[in-house]
C-alpha cells in the first residue's frame, strides 16, 4: 500500500527521519509531505506515533483526469463499495488544477457525484455528505493531466493533541503547537537523551539528561518534552480516527498497537531526566505553569527564576543536555534580557556541548550569540514567519579556538530596512558571545 504523511513546510527532513525511525519502508521526502509504503500496520504506526505529521493518507488510486468527464469516469471505476463503510458520511476536498479543471470546488463535486453514483449502483444507497465532520474524508489531488485520490486516516489533524484541560488553560495565550514543539525538540536530540542509559558515574554524580527551556512561553515545548520523556504515543488518547470509516480498518490490529504503546509507556517510567523551565516574561511563565499543572505534568517540570545561576543550580549535574526556546512571542521590551540569558547559558561549562534550538525572528539569536547557526529552518508558527535556528555549541567552540587564539566566524550580512531598524536597537546584549 502507498501512504504519505503531510506536514508544514520546513518539516520534511525531520518527518522523513521520524518515519524511518518508526521502521517504515521506502520513505521519500517531498515538498510538504513524506511518502512511504507498507501494509495497514505501517499506516497505523504513522498515525499513532508521528509527532511531526499533520495527517496520514492512504492512496486509493491514481488515474487520468484531463477533463470533468474523465475525472468522473475514473472515480466511478473505483470500487467504493469495498472502501467506504456502509452508512459512513463522506467529504471530498480537492487541491490543484489541470488545464480544464480549474475550480477545486467543481472538481470535488464531480468526484463526489461519481462516488455516490457508484454506491447507488452497487449497494442501492448513496453516501451522505457531511462537509464539517465526515466519517471518511477523501483528498483529490490534481496536477497536469493526472489525479490521485487518498483517504485521510487521521480525521482531525494529528497536531490536535493537547490535553483538554491544558487546552482550556491556554485559551487566549500563545501556546506552541505540538508538532512545532516536536520539531524544535528533534533538532536537539531530546528523544535520544531520554533513551540514554545512565552510567555508574552518572549515578554517582547524580547526573541526568537535562532539557532547559530558556523561554517557555505558553508551555508548548514543555508538554511535548514530557510526552517524549514518558514515551507517550501522541495518538494514544485520540478517540476518533478517519480510518474507522474505511472497510479495511482492522480493529484487532489497532488495539494490538495501542497495547504495545501502553507497554512502552509503562517501561518508560524507569527513565530519569530533568526539565528546567524559565521565562523572562512573568505572564508567559504563569501560563506555562498553568498548562503543565492542568496536563498533570507538574512533577516533571522544575520552574525557576530566569537567572542563569539559578537555572544551572536547578539543572545540577548533567548527563547530556539541550537548550530550547520559543522567543517568537517574547515582548520586544524583554528581548534583550531573554537573549542575555541564553547567551549566559551558552557560556556555562556545564552546557559546553549542549545544542541550542530556538524559534526566533529576524536572526536575533544568532546575532546575540555571535555564531552562525548550524542550520536555520524557515517555519510558520501561528501563521507568522519565523526561523528555527540550531546551534551546535560543541562544534562552534572547536571552530572558535585555534592554537589558543580565538577565531570568530563572520555572520552573513543581514539587511534591516530603515523603517524597521529602530525596533531592533537595544535588543541584543553587548558581546554576549564573549567569554
Which residue ranges define each predicted feature?
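Short beta-strand/turn micro-motifs composed of small residues
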Residues: 7, 279, 358-360
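Short, charged/polar, Gly/Pro-enriched secondary-structure boundary elements
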Residues: 41-48, 156-159, 398
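Phosphate-coordination loops involved in phosphoryl transfer and adenosine-cofactor binding
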Residues: 86-89, 208, 271-272, 353
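C-terminal edge-of-domain segments
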Residues: 138-152, 386-391, 409
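Conserved S-adenosyl-L-methionine
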Residues: 176-310
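C-terminal catalytic and target-recognition region of SAM-dependent MTase-like enzymes
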Residues: 307-435
